[in-house]
Amino acid sequence: AVADAAGLKAVIIDVESLAALSAFELIERQLPEGGKNQVLALVDAGANIMNLTVLRNGQQIYAREQVFGGGQLTQDITRHYGMTYEEAEASKRAGNLPEGYEAELLNPFMENMALEVSRALQFFFTSTQYNKVDHIILAGGCAVIPGIDEVVATRTQVNTLIANPFANMVVSDRVRAKSLLADSSSLMVACGLALRRFDPL
């Protein structure tokens, strides 16, 4: 329906979580020893859903989806400051919310996200033979929050980094490098789709 409305014809449809995994190979290359023989937890937290995918040597060994995302922070902003959802989302992205926002809303949200990541990992540990992960890689819209990697690392006691699939790519002069860097973690799915191999029709 969306493609039709845009005047486009959908030829191929992909699954969001699989598209993110396609880009994950670029992240693995940035890890010590290319992530070889390491247990890696990819946490993709978007507006409403958080996906945990655990991989070892490029193979998925666990996946879990739970309801959590940046939309909850936006809802908190709408209630706290009497904004519409659109105003709250725009203010959140622009970083022009009233004084006290960080202490009252942002920091508690970050702690809550870290707790959700920790819980998701506990589910992984109790349902597999694994009892640790070597790295947590944060992706999705929530990963652009400054300092979220440190909060998650403190809660989980696991080395945590922000996904940047473009880290080792040559960027065109027409692309705003600063904006790309700021949004890189939220572009994992888009990057994965761009890397997709197309079979001839």
Residue ranges and their predicted role:
Residues A1-L201:
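Hydrophobic/aromatic-enriched cytosolic interaction surfaces used to assemble or bind macromolecules
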